[in-house]
């Protein structure tokens, strides 16, 4: 195939899609250029599904190579290792809008690999990777109901910005990524500075409108490349088996969905499934019905029963009305030795959230392609298997946990103080102890309380809520505070976090086409009402940050010295600073501009370290009297330490008004003496006098 190139303007970027020259053995391969940021994106689909495969094995890997930024990786091995948090998040970003566009029965393995090969630090690779994945799938001839496109939207001075650069985003009130087909929005991911629902919805529609040109370009590329449509055919439905299953189930599932408790409902449905499949086993053997097919169709009946019940009765499976939020319990200060903690329970979803305060030194150093930087606000989300009553793998966080942690972090980011306002590294950990839907939003609520309990001066409390949708034809219902089953069996997962003032984070995943702007508008308004209700319930626990830090949290003292004095504080080989930290039990961070931050759980120790540093950095003033210690005896006089690191000479003639034959007769090493500073010469040498003090000259150094 000859090389095919498509170039177009997308926001302020010139975008080029190329195929036919590189990675020609892949099912589909595209070079995507956003100015100097260049990615190779490939898509490969297996020819057939594995025997017994009962799920769609789609894997997406986004990777940033260090050579793309002209850097060599750190570490011992000097090569890229496991995926970074950013790579994991962008992999999920690509996966989410693509997965629902494959047919339900398609079980062939599909792998998408997006490799950043050249990176302009001002142009991120996320939108290029999404566009490249869509183009590669379109070229691979898979049964992919695309193409999709993506756009990033910023917001500044009341104007939307298409595909803002990293620099643009620094003073943008919004960073929103939207992906979708020509007719529908499928995915939204965003963080915002407390914007209104109208502005957020406007950004989604703006991005969807602007991405249409990309969809047209991908279609043209596929046509010119001569891509053949997929020959995959969905397996035929076994109508006899489905009819027999429906007859055997009868109205048992409808009754089971009336059970309000999650675990009891799950047990009831499992019992029905076991009985029905057992009753049908003899006929299944005769007819040749596979057990997997029966189980799949039973799941389809579950899906239809729950959806039909909600649409017809407007009552949900736990008995709530469509817009009712589950009962909420919120407590702050639940763990005695942590710096801040909260327990947030909403129905059968529960999170214990802990805040820990550290110094700037505790920040996480990120070794990225665009350069090294430090992260001083960390948010970690843990989802242990016991939270849903199961046994399972326990260890390193999975992709889902990283994604949920990032969403919860986005929820509170807009209200966090700057490092200048609150010079602590802050780590928030959300431990999900129970889960029945919306655990990431429970993490937002719990983190808001835990931060306030720790005394972090957040601008306002934050709450989050997950919305759902059930839609059949023109009939639809929007659900507030969805359960796990409603998320699994519904058409939309729509998470909104924010304060009473506005939205701080929005995440949307839509499984169907046909969701209109009006439906999204209703969902946002219903979410706002739910969010305000949750904030009201949280107010029973805590409404403002505590004025005092925990007794176990480090106290920070900040002082400023002249940058030229830094070497005096550090001392030869770090001896001075090490002595201060060892003697006072403090942690001291020195910045290049002369800012010194002293951290200690003990306020008295911090003050002692501060005094030591002030003594070291204070200038010796001629005419002042200091109390010093005799450091060394010489034939011609004695050296006296008057400040840490500052020795002066008392000449033999300045020891006493009487004649001194031998210095050792008057002074001994270790003696405390009062001396007057006679002179500090250009070389910094200090001349001292004991005699002048005895004669009543000089002013004490402590006097102002």
Curated annotation (Swiss-Prot):
Enzyme Commission number(s) from the entry? 2.7.7.8
Q: Where is the S1 motif domain?
A: 623-691
Query: Which top-level group of life is the source organism from?
Result: Bacteria
Residues reported to bind Mg(2+):
487, 493
**Which SMART domains does this one have?**
KH, S1
Q: Which GO terms describe its cellular component?
A: cytosol
Reactions mediated catalytically: RNA(n+1) + phosphate = RNA(n) + a ribonucleoside 5'-diphosphate
Cofactor dependence is on:
Mg(2+)
Its annotated compartments are:
Cytoplasm
Q: Which GO terms describe its biological process?
A: mRNA catabolic process; RNA processing
For this protein, the record's SUPFAM superfamilies field holds: Eukaryotic type KH-domain (KH-domain type I) (SSF54791), Nucleic acid-binding proteins (SSF50249), Polynucleotide phosphorylase/guanosine pentaphosphate synthase (PNPase/GPSI), domain 3 (SSF46915), Ribonuclease PH domain 2-like (SSF55666), Ribosomal protein S5 domain 2-like (SSF54211)
* PROSITE patterns assigned: KH_TYPE_1 (PS50084), S1 (PS50126)
**Molecular function terms from GO:** 3'-5'-RNA exonuclease activity; magnesium ion binding; polyribonucleotide nucleotidyltransferase activity; RNA binding
Extract the Pfam families matched here: KH_1, PNPase, RNase_PH, RNase_PH_C, S1
What class does this enzyme belong to in the EC scheme?
Answer: transferase
The record describes its quaternary structure and partners as: Component of the RNA degradosome, which is a multiprotein complex involved in RNA processing and mRNA degradation.
Task: Report the family membership.
Answer: Belongs to the polyribonucleotide nucleotidyltransferase family.
Function of this protein?
Involved in mRNA degradation. Catalyzes the phosphorolysis of single-stranded polyribonucleotides processively in the 3'- to 5'-direction.
Cross-referenced NCBIfam families: polynuc_phos, PRK11824.1
Question: What's the protein here called?
Answer: Polyribonucleotide nucleotidyltransferase
Q: Which gene encodes it?
A: pnp
